[in-house]
Design a protein with these regions (language model features):
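Metal-dependent nuclease catalytic cores that hydrolyze phosphodiester bonds in DNA/RNA
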Residues: 1-108, 233, 237-274
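Cys/His-rich finger/ribbon microdomains and the adjacent scaffold used
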Residues: 2, 8, 12, 36-39, ...
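A residue-level signal for conserved active-site and pocket-lining positions in enzyme catalytic cores
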Residues: 15, 102, 132, 213, ...
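Flexible loop/turn segments at secondary-structure boundaries
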Residues: 28, 120-121, 155-156, 259, ...
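Conserved DEDDh/DEDDy metal-dependent 3′-5′ exonuclease domain
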Residues: 83-89, 93, 97-101, 112-115, ...
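Conserved RNase H-like, two-metal-ion catalytic cores of nucleic-acid enzymes
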Residues: 91, 280-361
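Short acidic-glycine loop/turn motifs at beta-strand connectors
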Residues: 105-109, 145, 222, 325-329
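Acidic, Mg2+-coordinating catalytic module of metal-dependent nucleases/exonucleases
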Residues: 157-225, 244, 426-492
């Protein structure tokens, strides 16, 4: 009989094939990408922080994950000795095992605590918590109460972090209600895994929910490029088409109901057709007042706040780029990049940024963004943080305009955009030689991650990193200028 971990059980609930591949076809699994590794690292950091809220515990973390016996024995011993707190208490029973984040004795009660990096309890959290309770109970150590411990996104950092950064929610009732269901599925999955034959499972919404699948590339290999699953905001349409054996966007029948943007996708692929509504585009951009300030923020959004007066997962600006276009065509560039050290030494990089705004922005002319809601919200948050600068910051907000609706609204479409209206989808269609490929930092996620890592690692003097971040952000606003000038030329 195969022994299932908590994560394997969750995989099996998501898809029979996923858990079967975990045991029999690991060769199909793709290497862990940077984004997934970042999620793992975040979970580890939050787990360590949660332990600090229950200090001086015994640590049962296995030294060798292929041999859990020492951890199981230590957990039993410390529980019998009524140790107040145990980290990674390990249990095994009924062909399953689990390692509990925190086992805490609160008076006469024993609490099981599972730690999550989310800001609420998700439905799928009950799956792994219920499995953990099942294993603990059948190992002879049923906790009195089961808690989910997750990030409180209303917590505001002021100096040292406190326990209020976490929320504890009692989910004992839900976990108990799931015990029969856990046993049935554990038995079903165990029996299925005894058969060395790949189970039958069609692709479906479960391939990406509640988690992306490491084997999707294998199960979806029959799906062609430019498939119906690439329809923008497709919802159920792709599955309706798939069930009719219609796989490619260009094969979608004319009488099948599509949105304007989806029609542009189909016509673009079928006829290599570009679309431009000059009147609508002119109506958007011809009203903008010079000089035009093409503006873009870069932000970090750490689960564990690094700057006072910020909340978990709050978008905190650390950089901006600004290209200023005069009516006569003159173009100048301004920029700001905070020192990572200022996020931990008591300095206020956000105040420095606001002061730089005052030097870089004139008192007239529209501020051009790409997705204005993001920049506007950051400016409003800065106004809230610095009341003395609120009038100035709100005056900037009133001048903000947006390039995104031209493409998101389907007023300008190129087949190369596919289902996206992002800068990185639009730019290659307009200026194929102007790319991000020669940059060390090629997207906002990487910029955010690298800057945050420099704060965490105390890497405050890396001039190469600083140069790469500046080049990336400058490229974003210059791309906006190129897109704007292209549109002006087309509507003239």
């Amino acid at each position: 009989m195969k022994t299932l971990s908590k994560s394997r059980f969750v995989s099996g609930i998501q898809c029979d094939k996923k858990i079967w591949f975990d045991f029999y076809r690991k060769d199909l699994k793709l290497p862990t990408d940077d984004q997934t590794q970042t999620v793992f690292d975040l979970g580890h950091r939050i787990g360590i922080l949660a332990q600090e809220m229950f200090p001086n515990g015994k640590d049962a973390t296995p030294e060798n994950y292929s041999d859990l016996k020492p951890s199981i024995e230590n957990s039993k011993k410390w529980i019998s000795e009524k140790v107040e707190t145990i980290y990674e208490a390990t249990f095994s029973a009924k062909n399953a095992f689990c390692m509990l984040d925190i086992l805490h004795r609160n008076g006469d009660e024993v609490w099981a605590i599972e730690v999550k990096s989310s800001t609420s309890v998700k439905d799928y959290h009950f799956t792994d918590a219920s499995l953990q309770y099942f294993v603990m109970k059948n190992a002879g150590f049923a906790p009195d109460r089961f808690f989910m411990m997750y990030i409180n996104n209303q917590y505001v950092k002021q100096g040292e972090l406190t326990s209020e950064i976490f929320t504890l929610t009692d989910i004992t009732e839900q976990v108990l209600a799931n015990q029969e269901w856990v046993e049935e599925n554990l038995d079903r999955l165990s029996k299925m895994l005894e058969i060395e034959q790949e189970p039958v499972a069609e692709i479906g919404g479960h391939c990406s929910s509640p988690f992306g699948c490491d084997y999707a590339h294998h199960c979806w290999k029959h799906i062609p490029e430019n498939s119906v699953f690439e329809l923008r905001a497709g919802r159920n349409k792709p599955w309706n088409l798939y069930e009719q054996n219609i796989l490619r966007i260009e094969e979608i029948p004319v009488d099948f109901p599509l949105t304007h943007f989806q029609n542009l996708q189909r016509n673009g692929l079928k006829n290599d057709e570009t679309y431009m509504d000059q009147f609508a585009i002119k109506n958007i951009i011809s009203r903008w007042e010079f000089p035009l300030y093409f503006f873009d923020f870069e932000t970090i959004f750490p689960a564990i706040p690094v700057l006072d007066v910020t909340r978990p997962y709050q978008q905190v600006p650390f950089q901006y780029s600004l290209h200023i276009l005069e009516e006569d065509g003159k173009l100048t560039h301004k920029e700001f990049l905070a020192n990572p050290e200022d996020f931990s030494n008591g300095e206020n990089p956000l105040k420095q940024m606001v002061e730089k705004f005052k030097k870089d922005f004139g008192d007239k002319g529209n501020i051009v963004t790409y997705n204005q809601s993001f920049e506007i919200l950051r400016l409003k948050e800065l106004a809230q943080r610095f009341p003395e600068d609120a009038d100035f910051l709100y005056s900037l907000v009133e001048r903000v305009v947006d390039l995104l609706p031209v493409f998101q609204g389907g007023y300008c479409y190129f087949p190369a955009m596919k289902n996206s209206a992002s800068i990185k989808a639009v730019l290659p269609a307009i200026a194929p030689d102007f790319t991000y490929e020669n940059l060390e930092v090629q997207d906002g996620g990487a910029a955010s991650s690298l800057f945050y890592q420099s704060i965490e690692n105390g890497n405050f003097t890396d001039e190469n990193l600083r140069e790469n971040l500046l080049k990336y952000c400058e490229r974003d606003t210059l791309a906006m200028v190129i897109i704007y000038q292209f549109l002006v030329k087309k509507i003239s």
